[in-house]
Amino acid sequence: MSEYQPSLFALNPMGFSPLDGSKSTNENVSASTSTAKPMVGQLIFDKFIKTEEDPIIKQDTPSNLDFDFALPQTATAPDAKTVLPIPELDDAVVESFFSSSTDSTPMFEYENLEDNSKEWTSLFDNDIPVTTDDVSLADKAIESTEEVSLVPSNLEVSTTSFLPTPVLEDAKLTQTRKVKKPNSVVKKSHHVGKDDESRLDHLGVVAYNRKQRSIPLSPIVPESSDPAALKRARNTEAARRSRARKLQRMKQLEDKVEELLSKNYHLENEVARLKKLVGER
């Protein structure tokens, strides 16, 4: 390439500038001649170098932008012909919404309510008279229900009686005594009757039937060598020995009681005989 021949990359062969694809080369000639003309041997990459003098590439920085946060006083309609005024909010309403106090509610005012609290209407009916007779009837009803262990299903509660209330109109009630709840387990008194007397033996205690075995018990032989079966056999044999020892002890105690009773009988007879001799002298 000679030094007098301009660069082929400086101009687009299609007739468009590399900076603007919608405009032709003829329209950009006047703009390019006013800014900077391409020199001989200049490549196409030099066209994309950003310079401070290029007004097309220069952009506004964020420092040049101004943001206006003020609320507009008017609003324009979509047709841009009429201007609609925006209503201003009351300062008291704004402060009530953004207040940090948890005791106040922005939608209601409690100053007027607190002053006239005595004039409020009661939610309950205070005109019902409560007398001491009503409370005494209620106490008796409570005592009767506590004394009965099993309440029948068809029991009807009287609707005319009143429960005791803390506020009484006639008089102040004395403190009611505490009612002791009966124990769930009631000990039954054992009365000795004819049936019980018939079950007593000659020693004055309850008789029991002693089973007399004609054949002694067979020895326990484990069925297998299973450890559980062996342990079960040993436990059964130990229980038999324990019952045998208990029966032997009971037999010995009965014999001892009979011996003591016979001695007591002889001693009483001896005392009676001696008293008789002393009385004769």
From Swiss-Prot:
Q: Spell out the protein name for this chain.
A: General control transcription factor GCN4
Q: What does this protein do?
A: Master transcriptional regulator that mediates the response to amino acid starvation. Binds variations of the DNA sequence 5'-ATGA[CG]TCAT-3' in canonical nucleosome-depleted 5'-positioned promoters, and also within coding sequences and 3' non-coding regions. During nutrient starvation (low or poor amino acid, carbon or purine sources), it activates genes required for amino acid biosynthesis and transport, autophagy, cofactor biosynthesis and transport, mitochondrial transport, and additional downstream transcription factors.
The reported effect of residue 82 to A is: In strain: CLIB 556 haplotype Ha1
Q: Which UniProt keywords apply?
A: Activator, Amino-acid biosynthesis, DNA-binding, Nucleus, Phosphoprotein, Transcription, Transcription regulation
**What's the short name of a Pfam family annotated to this entry?**
bZIP_2
The phenotype of cells or organisms lacking this gene is: Abolishes recruitment of the mediator complex to the upstream activating sequence (UAS) of amino-acid starvation responsive genes. Decreases RNA level of genes involved in amino acid biosynthesis and cofactor biosynthesis during amino acid starvation or methyl methanesulfonate stress. Growth dependent on amino acid supplementation. Sensitive to amino acid starvation. Sensitive to purine starvation. Decreases cellular glycogen levels during glucose starvation.
Residues of the region (Required for transcriptional activation) are: 89-100, 106-125
Q: Which family does it belong to?
A: Belongs to the bZIP family. GCN4 subfamily.
Q: Where is the segment annotated Disordered?
A: 217-248
Induction field: Translation is induced by amino acid or purine starvation, or during growth in low or poor carbon sources. Translational repression during nutrient-rich conditions is dependent on four uORFs (upstream open reading frames) present in the 5'-UTR of the mRNA; these promote ribosome dissociation. Translational induction occurs in conditions reducing translation machinery efficiency, leading to ribosomes scanning over the uORFs, and increased translation of the mRNA. The rapid translational induction is followed by transcriptional induction at later time-points, independently of the uORF sequences.
A cellular component term, taken from the record's GO annotations = transcription regulator complex
Complexes and interactors = Homodimer. Each subunit binds overlapping and non-identical half-sites that flank the central CG base-pair in the pseudo-palindromic motif 5'-ATGA[CG]TCAT-3'. Interacts with the mediator tail; the interaction with GAL11/MED15 is direct. Interacts with the SAGA histone acetyltransferase complex. Interacts with the SWI/SNF chromatin remodeling complex.
Q: Which GO MF terms are attached to this record?
A: chromatin binding; DNA-binding transcription activator activity, RNA polymerase II-specific; DNA-binding transcription factor activity; DNA-binding transcription factor activity, RNA polymerase II-specific; identical protein binding; mediator complex binding; RNA polymerase II cis-regulatory region sequence-specific DNA binding; RNA polymerase II-specific DNA-binding transcription factor binding
The processes (GO biological process) annotated in the record are:
amino acid biosynthetic process; cellular response to amino acid starvation; cellular response to nutrient levels; intracellular signal transduction; negative regulation of ribosomal protein gene transcription by RNA polymerase II; negative regulation of transcription by RNA polymerase II; positive regulation of cellular response to amino acid starvation; positive regulation of RNA polymerase II transcription preinitiation complex assembly
